[in-house]
Swiss-Prot record:
It comes from Saccharomyces cerevisiae (strain ATCC 204508 / S288c). The OSBP-related domain (ORD) mediates binding of sterols and phospholipids. It displays an incomplete beta-barrel containing a central hydrophobic tunnel that can accommodate a single lipid molecule with a flexible lid covering the tunnel entrance. The ORD can bind two membranes simultaneously. It has at least two membrane-binding surfaces; one near the mouth of the lipid-binding pocket and a distal site that can bind a second membrane. The ArfGAP1 lipid packing sensor (ALPS) motif is a membrane-binding motif that is sensitive to curvature. Residues 16-366 are annotated as: OSBP-related domain (ORD). It comes from the Eukaryota. This is Oxysterol-binding protein homolog 4. Lipid transport protein (LTP) involved in non-vesicular transfer of lipids between membranes. Functions in phosphoinositide-coupled directional transport of various lipids by carrying the lipid molecule in a hydrophobic pocket and transferring it between membranes through the cytosol. Involved in maintenance of intracellular sterol distribution and homeostasis. Involved in lipid countertransport between the Golgi complex and membranes of the endoplasmic reticulum. 20-hydroxycholesterol binds at Q96. It is found in: Cytoplasm; Golgi apparatus membrane. GO terms for biological process: endocytosis; ER to Golgi ceramide transport; exocytosis; maintenance of cell polarity; piecemeal microautophagy of the nucleus; post-Golgi vesicle-mediated transport; sphingolipid metabolic process; sterol transport. Changing K109A: Strong reduction in cholesterol transport. Abolishes binding to phosphatidylinositol 4-phosphate. Present with 32200 molecules/cell in log phase SD medium. Ergosterol binds at Q96. A 1,2-diacyl-sn-glycero-3-phospho-(1D-myo-inositol 4-phosphate) binds at residues 24-29, 109-112, 143-144, 336, 340, 344.
Length: 434
């Protein structure tokens, strides 16, 4: 049990969440559960293993068997790349969902980004010149609801990732925090594309003031080649199971995914630890697929604070983050209120002038209207539409991974707004530098 579990501030917090009804991201929390890190920084976790992020781009028709160490007899370069993309995705989960437990002692409530907040950096990969430079751009494109859009790209190896994320949280009667994720990520590797959906999750350990994340439900990785990976998450039960468990199956296409016996490969283990893979119809023993403990994360290179723009996360939240590290509740309240009041005044000024905040590098596209209706709409060959169709994924703003016809997809009045990176806007950027 955490040393904070019996504190009066924690008891008050538990009482407030028990009766809370609304967006939990706006709920105040005691200082010891606050993180000094903004949600805009979470985008970096997608590429903290550059060698795995870029590996699919090095696989071609001539070398795919030698690159696929887990199966030297892999049937095609497309399948070798899908295995590499799956390994990359699994490698992102530890950073995304349990790195704060290791560095901060338990899961913390991140800072709520303000509209227009930015976080940028790069992986220079100096020890691996063949990797080239990988760039991260993250922007808070909406505050109500809170939405973070991001792009990670490596021009040398023609790898591009873009996506956006939004969460909605609620408490169960047992005070377990359930989190629905919204949004998706798209990965382009030269001529192939992959659509990735994040899983739902829940946070346990709240009653004892020692929160930790457990993933649940499913994630999908849909390839433009037709290949599909379905990842099912489970946690430790009262009587059995291990924490952070998953089972992933790779299929020839979404039709085959209806029958688990048709899986080409099955991968199982712990996403925060090790996992093994076995090939269909093979009597050989399973092989090691990935071990999170063996490959340390490579952290993003972010320029010094004095060189950052006022909109950049670490500069904007510097005083608040410092107060959180000190555990000074009064100073946290003072510095946080000052920043938030400044942002409210900006919104009031914009409203008075009849203008709205201009997003810097991302634009929202409406997938529910036609070009004649005057909105920004996707093109006919839109990658997301193609991949969503192959997966039978809902294009509405339903929880990530919602399939067409699911309960969430059938809800009325759902919009279909999705955020897309505009590379030309970054190329024209004058104020923000890496």
């Amino acid at each position: 049990m955490s040393q904070y579990a019996s504190s009066s501030s924690w008891t008050s917090f538990l009482k407030s969440i028990a009766s809370f009804n609304g967006d939990l991201s706006s709920l105040s929390a005691p200082p010891f559960i606050l993180s000094p890190i903004s949600l805009t920084e979470f985008s970096q976790y997608w590429a903290e293993h550059p060698e795995l992020f870029l590996e699919p781009s090095f696989i071609n028709d001539d070398n795919y068997k030698e690159h696929c160490l887990i199966d030297p007899e892999v049937e095609s370069p497309e399948l070798a790349r899908m295995l590499a993309v799956t390994k990359w995705f699994i490698s992102t989960l530890k950073s995304q969902y349990c790195s704060r437990n290791e560095s901060l002692g338990s899961e913390k409530k991140p800072l709520n980004p303000f509209l227009g907040e930015l976080f940028v950096g790069k992986w220079e990969n100096k020890e691996h010149p063949e990797f080239g430079e990988t760039v991260l751009l993250s922007e808070q494109v909406s505050h109500h609801p809170p939405v973070t859009a991001f792009s990670i790209f490596n021009d040398k190896n023609k790898v591009k990732l873009q996506g956006y994320n939004q969460i909605k949280a609620s408490f169960t009667k047992s005070l377990m925090l359930t989190v629905k994720q919204f949004g998706h990520t798209m990965l382009d590797i030269k001529d192939e594309s992959y659509l990735v959906t994040p899983p739902p999750l829940h946070i346990e350990g709240i009653l004892v003031a020692s929160p930790f994340v457990e993933l649940e439900g499913k994630s999908y990785i849909q390839s433009s080649t037709g290949l599909l990976c379905v990842i099912e998450f489970s946690g430790r039960g009262y009587f059995s199971g291990k924490k952070n468990s998953f089972k992933a199956r790779i299929y020839k296409d979404s039709k085959d995914s209806k029958d688990k016996e048709k899986a080409l490969y099955t991968i199982s283990g712990q996403w925060s630890g090790s996992s093994k893979i076995i090939k269909a119809n093979k009597k050989e023993e399973s092989r090691l697929f990935y071990d999170a403990a063996r490959i340390p994360a490579e952290h993003l290179n972010v320029k010094p604070l004095e060189e950052q723009h006022p909109l950049e996360s670490r500069k904007a939240w510097y005083d608040v983050a410092g107060a959180i590290k000190l555990g000074d509740f009064n100073l946290i309240a003072k510095t946080k209120t000052e920043l938030e009041e400044t942002q409210r005044e900006l919104r009031k000024e914009e409203e008075a002038k009849g203008i709205s905040w201009q997003r810097r590098w991302f634009k929202d596209f409406d997938y529910s209207v036609t070009p004649e209706e005057g909105a920004l709409v996707p093109e006919k060959d839109d990658t997301f539409l193609k991949l969503a169709s192959a997966l039978n994924l809902s294009t509405k703003n339903a929880p990530s991974g919602t399939l067409v016809g699911d309960k969430e997809d059938r809800k009325e009045d759902l919009s279909s707004i999705h955020w897309r990176f505009q590379r030309e806007l970054w190329d024209e950027e004058k104020e923000i530098v890496l």
